Amino acid sequence: MIEKAGSKVEKRSSKGGATVLIVGAGPAGLVLGNLLLAAGVDCLIVERSSRAHVERRARAGFLAAETVRVLVGNGLGAGLLARGRTHGTCVFRTERGEFALRYGSLGRGEAHTVYPQQDLVSDLVAEFLRRGGDLRFGTPVSEVGGLDGERPWLMAHGPQGPYRLTGRYVAGCDGRQGTCRRQIPAGEVRAHRRRHGVSWLALLVGTPPALPAVTYAVHERGFAGHMARTPSVTRYYLQCEPGTDPGSWSETAVWDELDLRMRAERFGPLRRGPVLERAVVDLESDVLDPMQYGRLFLAGDAAGLISPSAAKGANLAVMAAQTLARAFTTAVHEGDEEALARYSATCLPRIWRAQEFSHWMIGLLHAPHGDDEESRFLRALRDSRLENLRTSTVQQHSFADNYAGL
C-alpha cells in the first residue's frame, strides 16, 4: 500500500493494469482520474496523443457555475480561480438593433467562468501527476475486451510496443471517434443522432476581445459569433456552407465578412489580427443510451456529442466524471454496484436537457437563406423568438437558467 493524495491506494504493476482503466486524457478522463485518486481508487489513464498536443488543443472555455463548484470542491480549481474571468452577459445583434441579456443576474443568478479548456486540461494533468497518478501519453488503444466478464482488458500501444492492461472497470473517455464506443456490440446501445444542417467556420485569432461580452449576430448572410478566450486571444464563428474548405477563406475575406455580419459599421470596429487556427465545424448531436455496456462506462464525447451552440460539452463531461467517480468509489470500497448500474439513468436527463437547449439555440441563431415560402416562414419564426427574448422577462429568466445551468 502506498500513500497518494491523502488516501491509501493499492498499487499494481507498471504495465499490468489498475482497478479502473481510463482511456482518454480530456476533461472527463482527467477529472475522473483525479477524483478516483483522491478517493483511494487505483486507476491509470492512457492517451493516444502527446502531452504537448493535449495541453495546447484549443477548445471551448465557458465553465458553468456547477462545474466550477465540482472542480474547486475537489481541489482542481486553483488555476481557474486565479486566471478565470467571470462572464454574465451575452449580446444579440439583429437588423433591428442590439440587446444585452445580463443572465448572471437572472434566473438562478449564475454566471460562467471563462477559462480555456487547454488551460484546464494542463491543470488537471499536473494535478493528476502530482498526486502520483499513472498517465501514459502517446499510447493509443486498439481494442477493448472482456467487457461482459470480471476482468476487462485493453490493448495499448506504447513506445516499446503493444501490451495488455487488465482491470475491474474501463472508463471510455476517448471521444466520439475513440476506440471505446466502437467496442460495444451492435444492438446493445441505441444512438440518437441529429445533423443540424449548419456548419461554422471556427476561427481562433491573435487579438484581444473586441467586445466585452459574448455576442451573437444574426444576419441575412448567416450567423457570426464573438467569444472571448484569453486577454490576447478571441474565438469567432462564421456560418458557412457544409463542406467548405477552411483554407478557401483568406484573412481579408474572414475579417470583411465578420465586419459585415457583426455590423461593425453600426456598432463599432472589430480588432483585426492574425488567424491562428481555423476549422469547419458541422453542428451535430448524438446521445448513446445507455452510456455503458458490461464493464465499460462512457463519459464526455464518447457518450454523446453536443453542438457548440450552447457551450455545454466540457461541462457535461465534468458532471459525468463526478457521477462515475462516485459510483466506482462505492463499488470498490463497499462492494455495491447499484450506482454503477444506474449511471446512465443518472446522467441522461441532464444530457437531454442540455441537448434540448442547444437545439433551441441553433434555431434561435440560424434560418434558411432562400426566398421560398418555407424559408421565409422559418426566418419569421426565428425573428419572433429573438423579439420574445428581448422583451419577455419570463423568457429571459428561462434562458438564463438554461444558458448558465446544467
Language-model region placement:
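Glycine-rich FAD pyrophosphate-binding loop
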Residues: 37-59
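C-terminal helical "tail/cap" subdomain of flavin- and related membrane-associated enzymes
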Residues: 3-14, 311, 326-406
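Extreme N-terminal leader/targeting segments of oxidoreductases
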Residues: 1-20, 35-39
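Conserved SAM/SAH-binding loop
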Residues: 138-142
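Conserved FAD-binding catalytic core of PHBH/FMO-like flavoproteins
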Residues: 126, 133, 143, 149-279
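Generic enzyme active-site microenvironment
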Residues: 45-46, 172, 217, 299
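Conserved mid-domain beta->alpha element of the FAD-binding
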Residues: 23-38, 124, 279-360
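Active-site-adjacent segment of FAD-dependent monooxygenases/related oxidoreductases
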Residues: 56-59, 64-131, 355-358
